[in-house]
């Protein structure tokens, strides 16, 4: 009898669970302004969102470790969650947001007015970087390296990953086995929760996406 390939590296091992939490609001969030690698603290609204997410996570299954992007809005969110969970935060530089270059601080409408040809290419092709910035493909390379390290070093654990819209979308694309340009079709709100269980490096099951039921 021919063996059936399931795609599971080790089906008898405990999965590694990643809970992907997007940071809370900053002062740029209400106007949907691009905020790549600029340093922004959480706004009052963002702090409330982070506290609500932290309470939700603390009421759920145990979490073993909190890993965060180094950018302030993520670190602030992670600190609130870690305090609620009784944990400390580990920083991973590769989980930082995409560098949007010259577009930081602008809305999409402003970018479409100022850089019409650049933004048209950027919205079609994840290999296309913004002027002075980083492509989604380059972001994916480092985010996937962070994911590989996590799956190697935290195998069988439940990990809270606090990051940004682009890295979380990239991890969802990887888990779903879909092309990177699927990121253009995903929506993630502030302080949303997403959950992936990994069986090895490649096979994964996505349990939830953009869960904001904990927010007021």
Where are the model-predicted features located?
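Short basic (Lys/Arg) and small-residue
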Residues: 164
């Amino acid at each position: 009898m021919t063996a059936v390939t399931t795609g599971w590296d080790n089906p008898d091992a405990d999965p590694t669970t990643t809970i992907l939490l997007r940071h809370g609001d900053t002062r740029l969030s209400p106007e949907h302004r691009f905020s790549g690698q600029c340093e922004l603290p959480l706004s009052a609204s963002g702090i409330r969102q982070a506290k609500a997410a932290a309470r939700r996570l603390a009421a759920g299954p145990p979490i073993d470790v909190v890993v965060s992007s180094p950018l302030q809005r993520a670190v602030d969110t992670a600190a609130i969650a870690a305090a609620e969970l009784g944990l400390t935060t580990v920083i991973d530089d590769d989980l930082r947001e995409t560098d949007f270059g010259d577009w930081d601080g602008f809305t999409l409408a402003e970018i479409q007015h100022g850089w019409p040809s650049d933004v048209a290419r950027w919205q079609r092709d994840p290999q296309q970087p913004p002027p002075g910035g980083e492509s989604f493909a380059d972001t994916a390379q480092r985010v996937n390296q962070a994911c590989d390290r996590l799956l190697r070093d935290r195998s069988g654990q439940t990990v809270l990953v606090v990051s940004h819209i682009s890295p979380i979308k990239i991890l969802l694309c990887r888990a779903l086995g879909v092309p990177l340009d699927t990121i253009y079709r995903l929506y993630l709100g502030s302080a949303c929760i997403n959950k992936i269980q990994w069986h090895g490096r490649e096979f994964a099951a996505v349990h939830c996406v953009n869960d904001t039921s904990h927010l007021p």
